[in-house]
Amino acid sequence: MGAYKYIEELWKKKQSDVMRFLQRVRCWEFRQLPGIVRVTRPSRPDKARRLGYKAKQGYVVYRVRVRRGGRKRPVPKGIVYGKPKNQGITQLKFQRSLRSVAEERAGRKLGGLRVLNSYWINQDSTYKYYEIILVDQAHSAIRKDPRINWICNAVHKHRELRGLTSAGKKYRGLRGRGHLYHKARPSKRATWKRNNTLSLRRYR
């Protein structure tokens, strides 16, 4: 087995003594640092490479901290108008994953870079930590590489804000295939619109 295979097996057994100790020490360190911080190299090189990372110019990795828990409805003093059914405030669940939120925060802060992918690295009772792989679309090494220069096209600006990354496609329900998923495409909203639009076709 190569080195990456050993690293992969280590990460598969997160409850082992080695990983528990490592993760506790790292988590303590992450808590002391800012919410978005650049890292020199990926914490999980095997995972990062599977998701498209290359150790060359133009690729950047940032660690993002996201607070865990549900989403509270942002209303002043808990005043929600309407029926009692819709007056919930605290026990609501955000429709997007925390990973997609981490990608969004990194993408907003680093507007000149393109978000390629992301992966989980750590968590404690309060936070989850993700590493985000970003690509500098203006770098000549990226623009010349046929495997990655697709991301230089203008259509890929802020793909993380439009649900086009892997995490984004997951929360949009686009991972599955077959007849069971026909209501998820092209999007939930488009399907709703198609089903709720009265179409009176001319008889020919």
Swiss-Prot record:
It holds the Pfam family Ribosomal_L15e. GO terms for molecular function: RNA binding; structural constituent of ribosome. Keywords: Ribonucleoprotein, Ribosomal protein. GO terms for cellular component: cytosolic large ribosomal subunit. SUPFAM superfamilies: Ribosomal proteins S24e, L23 and L15e (SSF54189). GO terms for biological process: cytoplasmic translation. Belongs to the eukaryotic ribosomal protein eL15 family. This is Large ribosomal subunit protein eL15z. It comes from Picea mariana (Black spruce).
